[in-house]
From Swiss-Prot:
UniProt EC number: 3.4.22.-
Protein name: Cysteine protease ATG4
Homology family: Belongs to the peptidase C54 family.
Compositional bias segments (type: Pro residues): 79-90
Signal peptide: none
Bias-annotated ranges (Acidic residues): 452-463
Catalytic activity: [protein]-C-terminal L-amino acid-glycyl-phosphatidylethanolamide + H2O = [protein]-C-terminal L-amino acid-glycine + a 1,2-diacyl-sn-glycero-3-phosphoethanolamine
Region described as Disordered: 48-99, 443-469
Quaternary structure, from the entry: Interacts with ATG8.
Entry keyword annotation includes Transferase: no
Length: 469
């Protein structure tokens, strides 16, 4: 439903229509479950907001979650929580339970969500479809048309051979990739800490300038398409998959960005420490903040339940000004319209979690192109606001597409050691694996014996051309 609405110009009536057709999720204020945004926890009951590493420096986030909820249940004399190995499914947005109905007798401001969570969520940089940018020429290759999404092929067959001045209908994965990269850079430059909208405006404008919809911007839609065509076999107007997106992020960042580096695993879940360290800390150099990108598939049609716990726990990883590791991921999901037909649909950027629900930023909203200003201070408040949203969207983990690109930021060697420890202690089945070296390339027999059985490779050739953005 949300995807269909995003492509319809409702003008001043959009908000009214959304209330009935696409309502925002509401928080169960009685149960007051913690809600997480990239490693920070928020709740309503006045208790101190926590980070996953507060007072528990040696406790994995998933275990900490169970301990925290058990203690809170005891303190408030609430009925005990279900076992930690059971799926943690909170009440739906509209609950029929007696206690929940009492909670919604009176209107709840901002859906009952903690104000700190809303402020944190809104501060995340949100890249969406854009229109009216400098046209991107179509490919002259005869195979280019067949590689386009269905909607774009129909337009071509109806005689529309004009260059692309909008990425609506094909650029959602690129926009999600931009969101991931922009928020990673923001954390390094601005600090995860308590940075919120309206603070360090000039620095934020310098960051947004790099993502402007202009060929001069290093991380523009034009730059992604240009590198996709030259190095990934992607034609202009063709839907990108996780692998192509990761390769573009890595190449563009390593060419233009001095504050971070990028390590990509390619099409599998295995991270090799020797390869990672060659990028993050070459001999004789200090450690460089490094974004690790993992392309993986956690099931066939849906995410296998054994991965649920680890996937949700990933968004609870600790971070602060000094400890900057956090997880984020992009996946194709099923929207309300396509659940019934079972067709894979869209790319979304996930940054938060509550129980078994995950919160995401949706790129399927077309806005006027973000201009390129030589002087970043020239960005208007409206242009900056177009890169943020307080609009919450969430999906249950069981409804997510299993094909995804996972990203996490390692700021220093302490982060790296902690990540390795947490991966070993995660509940359920780990979504990534860390080994000392690539046994195949290094000629060593060492490595995980179960690696061959576990790996499901993720190839853009298998996944991209059948999807519409």
């Amino acid at each position: 439903m949300e995807r269909a609405m995003a492509n319809v110009d409702l003008g001043p009536y959009r908000r009214i229509v959304q209330i009935f057709w696409d309502p925002e999720p509401t928080n169960d204020v009685v149960h007051d479950q913690p809600v997480w945004c990239l490693g920070r926890s928020y709740r309503l009951n006045g208790k101190k907001n926590i980070k996953a590493d507060d007072h528990h420096p040696q406790t994995p986030p998933s275990v900490l979650k169970a301990e925290t909820e058990t203690q809170e249940a005891h303190d408030t004399a609430q009925p005990p929580n279900p076992p930690t190995n059971a799926p943690d499914t909170p009440p739906d947005s509209i609950s029929s339970s007696f206690s929940s109905s009492l909670a919604y007798d009176d209107p709840v401001v901002d859906g009952g969500w903690p104000s700190g969570f809303i402020s944190d969520f809104e501060s995340k940089i949100w890249m969406t479809y854009r229109s009216e940018f400098e046209p991107i020429p179509r490919s002259t290759n005869p195979q280019a048309t067949s590689a386009l999404s269905l909607s774009m092929r129909l337009k071509s067959q109806l005689g529309d051979q004009s260059p692309f001045s909008s990425d609506s209908g094909w650029g959602c994965m690129i926009r999600s990739g931009q969101s991931m990269l922009a928020n990673t850079i923001a954390m390094v430059r601005l600090g995860r800490g308590d940075w919120r909208r309206g603070e360090s405006v000039e620095e934020e404008c310098r960051l947004l300038k790099d993502f402007a919809d202009d060929p001069r911007a290093p991380y523009s839609i034009h730059s992604f398409v240009r590198h996709g065509a030259s190095a990934c076999g992607k034609y202009p107007g063709e839907w990108f998959g996780p692998s192509a997106t990761a390769r573009c992020i890595q190449a563009l960042t390593n060419s233009h960005e001095s504050s971070i580096r990028v390590y990509s695993t390619g099409d599998g879940p295995d991270v090799y420490e020797d390869e990672f360290m060659q990028i993050a800390k070459p001999p004789g150099e200090d450690f460089h903040p490094t974004l690790v990108l993992v392309g993986t598939r956690l099931g066939i049609d849906k995410i296998t339940p054994v991965y649920w716990e680890a996937l949700i726990a990933a968004l609870q990883m600790p971070q602060s000004e000094s400890q900057g590791k956090y997880y984020q991921y992009i996946t194709r999901t099923f929207s309300a319209l396509t659940i019934r037909s079972g067709r894979p649909s869209s790319s979304h950027y996930f940054i938060g979690a509550q129980g078994s629900f995950l919160f995401y930023l949706d790129p399927h909203h077309t806005r006027v192109a973000l201009p390129y200003h030589e002087d970043p201070i020239e960005y208007t408040s409206e242009e900056i606001a177009s890169c943020h949203t307080p609009r919450l969207r969430r999906i249950h983990v069981r409804e997510m597409d299993p094909s995804m690109l996972i990203g996490f930021l390692i700021q220093n060697e302490v982060d790296w050691q902690e990540l390795k420890r947490n991966v070993k202690h995660v509940q359920g089945k780990s979504i990534i694996h860390i080994t000392d070296r690539n046994a195949v390339l290094g000629g060593s027999s060492e490595g995980r014996e179960s690696a061959i059985d576990e790996v499901e490779t993720l190839s853009d050739d298998d996944t991209d051309t059948i999807h519409e953005a």
